[in-house]
A protein has these predicted regions:
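Short, His- and charge-rich active-site/binding loops that engage polyanionic ligands
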Residues: 53
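Long, amphipathic alpha-helical surface segments
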Residues: 22-49, 59-95, 113-163
Length: 163
């Protein structure tokens, strides 16, 4: 009887694990904008009030915006703010077509001023799409190499750059 019960428990866990594995979707099945949102959420995480002037998923509070120091945004508010910012940056770089989402992600993290002066944008302007080295070079924080930023750039490039 114990063997039969053990067999059914093992069978049930196998069926449950298989169903859960089938429910997972590949990030590559999502539209590029949704992929970018997921990548930013993974690497930024939801900021706490102690990270002021950054709120949500890394949004830098600008003068005149309604966000107050010491107030935590909900996940829903942070997601809406992230999408709004990312759409704004996508529109800013829309003339670069399929590369606009990659430039928007870089601008979300570094700021549009950095992107506008970058070798990535200069290469894309002249039609050179060999930007891997230039894109992954944006991995420094306070002048020092930052492994997590490098990992982020690799992920963004692998998931968002299309040939």
């Amino acid at each position: 009887m114990k063997k039969l019960l053990f067999f059914f428990v093992a069978l049930l866990s196998l069926v449950a694990a298989t169903a859960a594995a089938n429910a997972k979707r590949s990030i590559m099945e999502l539209p590029p904008f949704e992929r970018a949102v997921l990548i930013i959420k993974k690497f930024e995480t939801l900021h706490k009030p102690k990270h002021w002037p950054y709120v949500g998923y890394g949004h830098q509070v600008q003068p005149g915006e309604p966000y107050r120091r010491g107030v935590q945004l909900t996940e829903r508010q942070a997601d809406a703010l992230l999408r709004k910012d990312l759409r704004k940056f996508c529109a800013l770089y829309s003339q670069y077509g399929k590369d606009s989402i990659l430039l928007a992600c870089l601008a979300y993290n570094c700021g549009p001023g950095v992107v506008n002066k970058s070798s990535v944008l200069k290469k894309l302007k002249v039609g050179n799409r060999d930007i891997f080295k230039a894109y992954t070079a944006h991995c420094r924080y306070k002048g020092k190499f930052h492994k997590q930023l490098y990992q982020r750039r690799l992920t963004e490039f692998a998931v968002l750059f299309s040939i």
